[in-house]
Curated annotation (Swiss-Prot):
GO terms for molecular function: zinc ion binding. The N-terminal and the C-terminal halves of the protein can associate with each other, thereby hindering interactions with ZYX. This is Testin. Residues 160-169 have a biased composition (Basic and acidic residues). Pfam families: LIM, PET.
Length: 423
């Protein structure tokens, strides 16, 4: 792949900018009524408020389940999905756990229940319940709670649909579609996994069973002695925090990492963003756990404009980020900026004409917009052209460049006398 480098002007400004004037207007189910939501046709943001879709997204449950179902399709985790008879689309079979208050229900008193929108897919409900209690309270996916909202946001952030489904991407070429399909197939076979919740003692017992099967001719007394000594020495430490796990507490295992490693439930996190791996879905690479987004980021450049992975041979690098050539464009007019001069406005690239028209500061002297390539003097929220025609004493018109001055509400004075004369 090769990259081009456009030219940035160093002008800084605090003004906000409007969304691009183009775009398909379609209001998705997660947009609130009355907000004037308009979806930009490839930026995945609102054209009116510039809020990124991934931070606004609250997908419907069936949309979430379709996305995760597609992720698990053609993997060893097909037991976690079911295909609808109507369209054959794989759906994620989330394990929903409902707990009833153990206190005996009294007459005319409703039974108190707690519903977890997701729980580890284990048969032992006590194990699942213990796992949930080891998570931070604000991250427990109890229906209607902050934790449930956290899970939904992480589903959107960690597992973007456009990282696995070419149809969710913007105008991929046939070659790019094929390359993306191969990329997805590769990470499904080499990196994707789902954590297992187990008791460390249970895993150790399984290891002992395998060990004893391999030494079936050893004397029983010796085998018993060795097992006792090994049990006393066994300590289970978390692969993330290195602290030991307490006896009787569940841990998470990742098959890709090997069952000699385990994690506390709250430590099963992405090594890049530090967030809990949503629904224990992980990607394993070079001894580290990743969420889907950051695993893909470690393999492919991601466009800062559309948030999609870049499969084309050429792309642009600017502002320490990568961009599709067609997506590094003015945030106001959508004109491509590759090889052109631009100005960053609230972390968004804007072409010079749009900057002058929509965002440039106004000179207090001549009341014209200040060109981004022209030097200026700024004090608090006021600016002047750094010229002998504009940066003058508001009373006697003395040039103040390189001189001391007294600012007063958009005016500048060369002396106390001039200030008094204008007061």
């Amino acid at each position: 792949m090769s990259a081009t480098h456009p030219t940035r002007l160093g002008t800084r400004t605090k003004e906000s900018n409007a969304c691009a004037s183009q775009g398909l207007v379609r209001k998705p189910p997660w947009a609130n009524e009355g907000e004037g939501f308009e979806l930009h046709f490839w930026r995945k943001i609102c054209r009116n408020c510039n809020v990124v879709k991934k931070s606004m997204t609250v997908l419907l449950s069936n949309e979430e389940d379709r996305k995760v179902g597609r992720l698990f399709e053609d993997t060893k985790y097909t037991t976690l999905i079911a295909k609808l008879k109507s369209d054959g689309i794989p759906m994620y079979k989330r394990n929903v756990m409902i707990l009833t208050n153990p206190v005996a229900a009294k007459k005319n008193v409703s039974i108190n229940t707690v519903t977890y929108e997701w729980a580890p897919p284990v048969q032992n409900q006590a194990l699942a319940r213990q796992y949930m209690q080891m998570l931070p309270k604000e991250k427990q996916p109890v229906a209607g709670s902050e934790g449930a909202q956290y899970r939904k946001k992480q589903l959107a952030k960690q597992l973007p649909a456009h990282d696995q489904d070419p149809s969710k991407c913007h105008e991929l070429s046939p070659k790019e579609v094929k390359e993306m399909e191969q990329f997805v197939k590769k990470y499904k076979s080499e990196a994707l996994g789902v954590g297992d919740v187990k008791f460390p003692s249970e895993m150790n017992a399984q290891g002992d069973k395998v060990h004893n099967c391999g030494n079936r001719h050893a004397p029983a007394a010796v085998a018993s002695k060795d097992k006792s000594a090994e049990s006393k020495k066994t300590q289970y430490s978390c692969y993330c925090c290195k602290h030991t796990t307490n006896e009787g507490e569940p841990a998470i295992y990742a098959e890709r990492a090997g069952y000699d490693k385990l994690w506390h439930p709250a430590c099963f996190i992405c090594s890049t963003c530090g967030e809990l791996l949503v629904d224990m879905i992980y990607f394993w690479k070079n001894g580290k756990l990743y969420c889907g987004r950051h695993y893909c980021d470690s393999e492919k450049p991601r466009c800062a404009g559309c948030d999609e992975l870049i499969f084309s041979n050429e792309y642009t690098q600017a502002e320490n980020q990568n961009w599709h050539l067609k997506h590094f464009c003015c945030f106001d007019c959508d004109h491509i900026l590759a090889g052109k001069i631009y100005v960053m406005v609230t972390d968004k690239p804007v072409c010079k004409p749009c900057y002058v028209k929509n965002h440039a500061v106004v000179c207090q002297g001549c009341h014209n917009a200040i060109d981004p390539e022209v030097q200026r003097v700024t004090y608090n929220n006021f600016s002047w052209h750094a010229s002998t025609e504009c940066f003058l004493c508001s009373c006697c018109s003395k040039c103040l460049i390189g001189q001391k001055f007294m600012p007063v509400e958009g005016m500048v004075f060369c002396s106390v006398e001039c200030k008094r004369m204008m007061s």
